Amino acid sequence: MIFRRRSPGWSYWDWLKHLGVSWNWRMVEDNHVQIGRYVLEVTPYYMELLWREWRAWKNWYLPPWSLDGKTVLDVGAGCGETALFYYYHGAGRVIAVEPESSLGPLLNRNMERNRWNMEIVERPFDKSMLRWSFDFMKMDAEGCETQLLSLGSLPPCAVEVHDKATADKLQERFEVEVLPQKENWILRNPSEHPVISNEGSNTNHNSS
């Protein structure tokens, strides 16, 4: 188990719950964390992100149906931290979209070390990617969420939205679930099927 100090704003109870989540985590090298059977090379920023948000990801980023053997489109893949999260929860394949060039080598090393069935896309998200074959999309890439406003349907997804105006427009257009957070909003289509726009657009990007 990894013991870390309480993060700012956490109660003692929050800290204990996070310790419970990390019961099978351990540092295997200075910058490598083992979670279950996976080993992730991380920067200090991504280690803190894993520690602070893994427990929340279970509420934000998992659909109510099984991901066993499914393909996840991970927009804003970072160093592979959310890919690890999805493999840990049964995903069979991840398409990792991460345009930040400095993260590419780290993401590739994590893929190779864990022998993940992964495709790495080192360019910015474009809504044409929604024509690819996948079962669920996670998006955390500031600014990309506005591209979803022009869609006729929204795939099964969890989208982190960084401004309220966009969150309101997406909720009005698609009638998706909204989980308000302190500084952002998590929009979810928990269905196994795309949700059609209320505006009846003929544009339809399915994720079959």
Task: Identify the residue ranges that each predicted region occupies.
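Residues at the starts of beta-strands that form the adenosine-phosphate
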Residues: 92-93, 117, 156
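Structured loop/turn residues at beta-strand edges in well-structured enzyme cores
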Residues: 67, 89, 116, 132, ...
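General small-molecule cofactor/ligand-binding pocket signal
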Residues: 119-121, 177-179
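A short acidic, amphipathic alpha-helical/loop segment
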Residues: 85, 89, 109, 147-153, ...
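Short, conserved SAM-binding/catalytic segment
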Residues: 107-118
